[in-house]
Amino acid sequence: KELYSLILFSGTDPDPRNRDTSRQRPFIDSEFFNFSYGRAEDGDRVIDAQYATSTRYVSTTMHGNATMFGVNFADGRIKVYPIGRDPRGRTKTFCVLYVRGNPDYGKNDFVGNGDGTVTDRATGLTWMKVDSAGLKAGPRGDGTLNWEEALEWAENLEYAGHADWRLPNAKELQS
């Protein structure tokens, strides 16, 4: 969650075959953090700008390799990456940003509120325990909503004595 917290959702997704990055915007604030796209002269694609985390994935991927979570600031995705060899047989290398400070950052601290909601004391966010299907939300009454319907439903929702519900943003949903 630490590395994910640095993602800017205003980046542009590059064409991995295009070598010109002059009109691209990375998904990290390059005013504060050094960033470079993958370099063709190193045998990389433009999108080869994966940053490693210390969080291992519980299973394996790509030819049974052990895997860890990472963030790609070239294309704005959180992914799992093989630890060891890449699909081309090369030792997989990553960019790394080191962090210090609160080791409990990103750890949820849930408490049930007894009213069908849960508060995460770490973030201050209150979540509903049930999803839209449990509420029979939407025009079809089955909980399936398109994005516009979901926004409108949240705007008019009264639940557990509160009328200020909204859709979470991407970082809140990841929290």
Locations of regions flagged by a protein language model:
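Glycine-aromatic-enriched surface loops/turns that form tight recognition elements
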Residues: 2-166, 171-175
